[in-house]
């Protein structure tokens, strides 16, 4: 079983965990409809980079 050699101080523990927080994904706004969507994904209306690629929800 692994056992630590020395106790890690609260400061060092915090530095170790500094990058473990969650971030919100960046959203893009569709130029034709103004809807927000994930980058590199189609919008809910079915547009991608200003062009209609699929049928949207409810169509």
From Swiss-Prot:
Organism's domain of life?
Answer: Bacteria
Q: Where is the composition biased (Basic residues)?
A: 49-59
Question: Cellular component terms, GO, for this chain's entry?
Answer: large ribosomal subunit
Could you tell me one molecular function GO term of this UniProt entry? Answer: structural constituent of ribosome
Give GO BP annotations, semicolon-separated: translation
Q: Which UniProt keywords apply?
A: Ribonucleoprotein, Ribosomal protein
Q: Could you identify this protein by its name?
A: Large ribosomal subunit protein bL32
